[in-house]
Amino acid sequence: MGGGFEKGGNVATFAEVAVDRKSGEVKVARLVTAFECGAIVNPDGLRNQLEGANIMALGGALFEAIEFANGQILNGRFSDYRLPRFSDVPVLETVMIDRKDIPSAGAGESSLVGVAPAIANAIFDATGVRLRSLPLVPNGLKVA
């Protein structure tokens, strides 16, 4: 049996949000992701993978939640489960750091790990409200 190894990527994410203090609506205006995974073999594929992961993470960060009552799932259909819509997708900026000096590594959905913390920190910066559980604003943000 051969030996295993792991080489992952490095990611940093920045979020810019707009908060309507009257309605409590939070809108992510921009997501910037910088990603390094060694030598980039397929730049278009990598960009698509990163942008898709960021949109997926946007839903989990803001409003995706399974609702329960008495041990039963209340929103078991996609018509009752809030997913990101085209109108939710912010401006996406992707910075791919191509390191020809090191071997390629897998990307997968690695970029999704930074999205929720970046959005939570942007909401805190805008409002002073620190949110610590996901989804961050399933029913709007309560701001004094």
Residues of each region from the PLM?
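C-terminal catalytic domains of large/alpha subunits in multi-subunit enzymes
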Residues: 2-144
